[in-house]
Amino acid sequence: MRVRGHVLTVDQPRPDGGKDTAPTPVELFVASVASCTTHYAGRYLDRHGLSRDGPAVRADFRMADDRPPRVASLSLTVDAPSLPAERLAALRAVVSHCTVSNTLADAPDMRVHVRCEPEPAEMPQAVEHGHVEAARHARQTGTECPR
């Protein structure tokens, strides 16, 4: 997968048909929330002239027991050992509203379109300018275009 020229590798565990060479899409989703939280924490610390040494974000998640498959709960813990106690509430407020967290709190409209072109182009998955395009060759997905 390519994102703004960067290459991300995504895979599945062996029991799920993958080779377990990279994180799963769900793990990348959770990492996205954690990294957004980390970014906002860093910006807060920088803005207030506080040390960035030591802050870390841990993300724990649980999958739903019922269908459809989805993340049922997500818990983030921000460790900021050098943060003065009087700034804890402010940091919590800032990191609770990172862009990814805001998106989860107010879910976007999501539509999935399936297209079939006469000759599907082999194209890597890409995220560009807020637009996601993904295509795979029909032989790779097992789908065939009507002729």
Where are these predicted regions, by residue range?
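Alpha-helical metal-binding/catalytic segments enriched in His/Glu/Asp
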Residues: 36-37
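Extended beta-strand/beta-hairpin segments
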Residues: 1-31, 41-147
